[in-house]
Every structure is written in C-alpha cells, then in structure tokens.
Amino acid sequence: MPSRVAPAMVAVLGLAVALGAAPRCVADEAASPPRAGSPFKLPPAVAHKGAIASAYPLATEAGQEILAKGGNAFDAAVAVSAALAVVEPSSSGLGGGGFYLLHRQSDGYETMLDAREKAPAAATRDMYLDKAGNPIPNASTDGSLAAAIPGEPAAFEYLARKYGKLPLKVSLQPAIRIAREGFSMYPRLLGSLRYKRDRMLKSPDTAKVFLTPDGNVPELGYIIKEPDLANTLEAIANEGAKGFYGGRIAQELVDGVRATGGIWTLADLASYKVIERKPLVGDYHGARIVSASPPSSGGVAVLDALNILSGFDLQAVDSGTRKHLVIEAMRRAYRDRALYLGDPDFVSMPLAQLINPDYAAGQRSSIRADKAMPSDMLPGIESQPVGMQTTHFSVLDSEGNLVAGTISLNLFFGIGYIPPKTGVLLNNTMDDFSIKPGTPNAFGLVGNAANAIAPNKRSLSSMAPTFVETKKGLMIIGTPGGSYIISMVLLGTLDYMDGKSAADIVADGRYHHQYLPDVVDYEKGALAESELAQLRGMGHTLKEGDRRWGNMEVITWDYTSGKVQAASDPRGDGEGLVY
C-alpha cells in the first residue's frame, strides 16, 4: 500500500490553513520532465500513483484507495466526494452540488462539470418576498422551501461513466464502508454541530445521526454512524443516478420535503442533469489560468482581478501598496460579479468582455496607487458574514489527469434537515439567488436580475476550482469560504506566481473586499500594523475577522525538479498525500 504523507506535509485537495500553524500535510515527490502537446505540458507519468488533498484524512485516503485499485483521478474524485459527504456533513453531501474542473491528459481535453443545484419547477421569482415586496427573514435559508434540487449524486455517475476507469460501485465503496462502520467526532465538526444543534433538534432523523439520544452534541471521539446514508449510497452504487433521482429514495426525499413546507416533485428529481461547460481560460504574466465558468462566478472574478493586476508591477511596490492594489482589483471584480453574472442557460452575460485585457485596462485606469475608491463611486447597484460551509479537494494521478472539485450544501449542514430513511442532509442553496436586487444574501453578497429565481435555474456561486500553469510548473487550487472563495483563490494564485511553496500558499494570511459592503475584512495577523496604518491612510475601512477563513487544498508540481507537493490548509482537519 502507498505510504501516507506525514502530518507535516502538504496536501493536494483543497484544505484550509490556520494562521500561525504549519500545513497539516506536505508531501514531496519527484516526477519525470514535462512534455509538450496538450494545453498543460504535463509529463506522461507522475511519481508513484499521484497526489490528493481534501478536508479530512478519511476522504483523502478513500481517493488513495481507489487510485491503488487502478482508478484514475476522476474515479478518485468520486470516492473523495462521497467520503466527504459522510465525514464532513457540514460542508457537502448528496443533498448538495458543486463544480468539477477536469483535465484529461491523454488528449488535453478540459471541461467543467456543472453539478450545481437547480431551483424546483414550482419556484417563482418572488417566493421569498412578503406582500410588500420585502424579503421574509430566513425564508431562503431555513426550512425545506430553501432547498434546491441536488446535483452531486448525478455527478458521481457522470464522472465514473464518462471519465473514470472503474465501476461506480467500486469508487463508492470507501464511503459506504465509513458510513456503516462510523468515524470519530473531530473538533471542527464538533464546533459546527454546536452552532446548529437547535436546528437539528427539529429534525428527528438529523438528531438521530449527529446528536446523542438526550439531544446533546457528542464529545470528541464519539463514533458517528450513518446507516441510512450508507443505504442511499448503496442504491446509487447499484443503480447509478436513478438510485437517487428515482425509486424509493426519490419518493422519500419528495415526501419529506413537501411534509415540511417544500415544493419538490418527483419530476424535479428525474429531470436533473449534469451539464458540461467550457472552462474559462486566461493569462497572467505568462501563466495559463483555467477556472470555473458560470453559473460559478469564481473563475470570471478571479480572471477579471488578475487582468486588472497584470498592469501593475506588484514586486516593485511596498507591501501596503501591493495589498491596496489587490483590494481595488477585488472591489471591481466583485462589482462585475454582482452586476452581470447568472445561469448561462437563462441570461446573456458579457463574459468575453469581463475577461478581456482591454476591459481590465479601463478598470485599472480608475485605480489610484495612493487612495481607495469608495464602492459607491463605481457604477453599480444599490445596496446596503464567512465560513467553511463548502469543501474543496484536488487530485493529480499518475497519468497526469487533474481534478479540482468544489462542492457544497451552502450554509453549515444546509437546512439541517434529513428526510426520513434517506440519510441525506438538504442544501439551502436557494439563498444564492438574488432574492431581491440589492439585498445581500447570507454571505453579504448582492445581486441583480441576472441571478433572479426562475424554475429549473441554477444560482450563481463563488466556487472557483482552478488550475494554474507556468513554464516551470503547475498548481491545482480551491477552497471553501462562500463569497471569500474568489479572494482566497486570487491570493493563492499571486502567491504561486511569487514562487511560494504549496505549504506557504495554504498557510498565508488572507484579506478580502467584495464591493459591498465597502469594507476590507482580514484575518488576525494577515496585515502588519504598518500595512493597516497605510491602508487606513488611503481611505480603506478595515475589519479584523473573528475567525479564520477557508480550508484551502493545493497541489503543486515543479517541472524542473519533478517535485510534487500536496498541501492541506492548517485551518482545517484535512490531509494531503503524495504516493
């Protein structure tokens, strides 16, 4: 069996790092030199079997197990996703969805699997507004009316059937085993359960799994078993996606949702389809950037910001000015996100313009190197919170195939409700629509008509699974963090371009500006006192966060030395393996 990377090593799948702590996993291995011929000039083989980084060791090891059985990166992505649904239920699951960025090395083919949740057919534009046209408090985050139709189970079958080498049944076995045998309560899960305990008490099936018989949050080390979820995974393993979107499981899901105020139908589930979309591709100082396309806004915003920054020499300015310029690029990229983006199957978007260097030059011309521009001075929309409520993983296999997967339930544990006999926690992704133009969602993001609710529509997301390649090497990067994802991936990309290691990229301090509210959020210790003073002097409003952000998972590959590193964010509990 391949050896496990020591806890001091860096991991490949999207884990998050705690400030002041070392990355939880760092692995270094050598690979053969790069070759030409595909968009990524990857060598035909990677050292050993590959690399994986994810938010929890059991999920990373599930992917490793599948690679060891002859699977490729796409099979491993199924195994890791399914295992995360079991062991990290606060952040993703069968009741959620997400995006999978893929690179197939044999022919250089790149694609993004859109497994984002979609609105039920009975959804309406004003479903969360009262008679006066004002948002009903918590209507889009609490209760079954907030749940969109899940996409993750469909992604499992799609990945295995179209891109994998192993039967779906094989790739799901690690997750099924963990769900039946159980896993130990760990600190981050314990903390999120304390946060959602009252919500879980309202759902008997949720409380049965995650709370003690007397309704309390379990102690560390308590064994959590999920037999109903194991049965649902077995149904998918045996029947494919129809084991979830049809038959008994589908009926149980619909009955449970409708009994608690939701509007799902069997037709909603039966009609769900994964959509392949062309990834966005950009250039930053000679690096090839590949990232998610709408309905994810992450790739657009990251490329928009990088294009703006490409006209500055960030190495030639002091650290405070550098951070000011990055903040101003964030401000403008998030403005464009709010104004223009939505589901490409429903709205027309100026994507070519938004990632065009000429457009970025116009944006850049409004930036002063010595002064912040208030967001209300940018043409925009009227208007007036951060987390780990998503998860990310990265995979590199021995053939050179790549996967960056970001998946979610939206907020912690979604709506906190498990329909009886399913084991499936449901999402509250309907909150990611623009409930009313200018009204912020749970992450403080505002939106416009392009992201308004419509039947069968997919809401905008900030997820940004990304590949970065230079002449010297490659990085796979992604992270959870709601609206902060874009800022974190941007900062990680800049770090990689500066030559930082995978360990340093996941561990670096983070700061963020999202256009509205007009505030620079930063992690404790991320900005030096001199930088804080300089930024305040430029007119920025600064706010120190009360907790750390994200759970970044990074894999890097140095073409010159052949070294592969997998780094898992020390802010989380994950693990990176190179073997």
Feature annotation, model-predicted:
Residues M1-A11:
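Bacterial N-terminal signal peptides that target proteins for export
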Residues M9-G20:
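Bacterial N-terminal signal peptides
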Residues K457, V489, M497-R547:
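Extended C-terminal subregions enriched in glycine
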Residues D28-E61, E65, A73-G240, F244-G246, ...:
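Noncatalytic scaffold domains of N-terminal-nucleophile
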